[in-house]
């Protein structure tokens, strides 16, 4: 049996964010130093996955709520941008590299998830092509640096799930969300507007286009704060907002709903929507 350790390279370093460890560390420290921790310790966060030039300061609002002293496992749920998936997929590697330090995948939890029969395996090529998970790795490493040898990650690529599948995966992940030492990171940008995205919703009553987009996204964020997956699904059906992480968000909302059935109380708060011309937000449970 081979004991070879398989690594996923930081394939977007040098383009979506700097490949220089010292420079990246300084950038992350700068963004984090500008925000306060008001919901700490968070049990789940939603943060964007665009290039750090566009979303670095926004993501800091979410990662500032992470408490490294109690967090031991970090589930990272990112949408699939390049391959069609009707389920969720697990990585085939052991280590995710970042310019700061390497992050270890929790093979014990991976084994538990794989045994359910609900998951696929993504190839290394698919893994390295996808940015939705990778963009959270440097921030994860930075937020956890004081306990960097004491935590593992559980990356999950989320496909175009049906509502029933979102419920199934939400129920599965709810037992992990219930554990205080586990953190869920949901990777999502909000509205993608224009010909490139085949989406041009415009409410003239809001004035300029960016104001219409701002109103649309705020509406979605308000519904997410209600922690009601049905209302969120209805919002998407009505407005077709191009929230790329809608399925990971749906899974998280269904996991929370499952816990609420058992009496657990949670609240969700959006901290910042950054520049509305960039249409991003950060949130924490």
Swiss-Prot record:
Gene3D superfamilies for this protein: LigB-like (3.40.830.10)
Disulfide bonding pattern of the chain: none
Entries under InterPro entries matching the protein: MEMO1_fam
CDD domains reported in the protein's UniProt record: MEMO_like
Protein origin, superkingdom: Eukaryota
Annotated transmembrane regions: none
Positions of modified residues (Phosphotyrosine): 210
Key words of the record: Phosphoprotein
Entry function: May control cell migration by relaying extracellular chemotactic signals to the microtubule cytoskeleton. Mediator of ERBB2 signaling. The MEMO1-RHOA-DIAPH1 signaling pathway plays an important role in ERBB2-dependent stabilization of microtubules at the cell cortex. It controls the localization of APC and CLASP2 to the cell membrane, via the regulation of GSK3B activity. In turn, membrane-bound APC allows the localization of the MACF1 to the cell membrane, which is required for microtubule capture and stabilization.
Xref: PANTHER family: PROTEIN MEMO1
Record protein name field: Protein MEMO1
Gene from which the chain derives: MEMO1
């Amino acid at each position: 049996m081979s004991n070879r350790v398989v690594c996923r390279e930081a394939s977007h370093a040098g383009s979506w964010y700097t490949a220089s460890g010292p420079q990246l560390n300084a950038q992350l420290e700068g963004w984090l130093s500008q925000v306060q921790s008001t919901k700490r310790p968070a049990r789940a966060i939603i943060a964007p996955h665009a290039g750090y030039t566009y979303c670095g300061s926004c993501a800091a609002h979410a990662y500032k709520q992470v408490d490294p002293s109690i967090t031991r496992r970090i589930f990272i749920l990112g949408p699939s941008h390049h391959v069609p998936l009707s389920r969720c997929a697990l990585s085939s590697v052991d280590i995710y590299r970042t310019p700061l330090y390497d992050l270890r995948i929790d093979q014990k939890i991976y084994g538990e998830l794989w045994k359910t029969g609900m998951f696929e395996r993504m190839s290394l090529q698919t893994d390295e092509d996808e940015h939705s998970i990778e963009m959270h790795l440097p921030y994860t490493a930075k937020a956890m640096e004081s306990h960097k040898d004491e935590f593992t990650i559980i990356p999950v690529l989320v496909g175009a799930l049906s509502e029933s599948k979102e419920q199934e995966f939400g129920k599965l992940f709810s037992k992990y969300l219930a554990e205080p030492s586990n953190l869920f990171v949901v990777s999502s940008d909000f509205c993608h507007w224009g010909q490139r995205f085949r989406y041009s919703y415009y409410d003239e009553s809001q004035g300029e286009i960016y104001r219409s987009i701002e109103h649309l996204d705020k509406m979605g964020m308000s519904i997410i704060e209600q922690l009601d997956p049905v209302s969120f699904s209805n919002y998407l059906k009505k407005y077709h907002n191009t929230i790329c992480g809608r399925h990971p968000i749906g899974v998280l909302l269904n996991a929370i709903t499952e816990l609420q059935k058992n009496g657990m109380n949670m609240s969700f708060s959006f901290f910042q929507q950054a520049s509305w011309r960039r249409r991003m937000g950060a949130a924490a449970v």
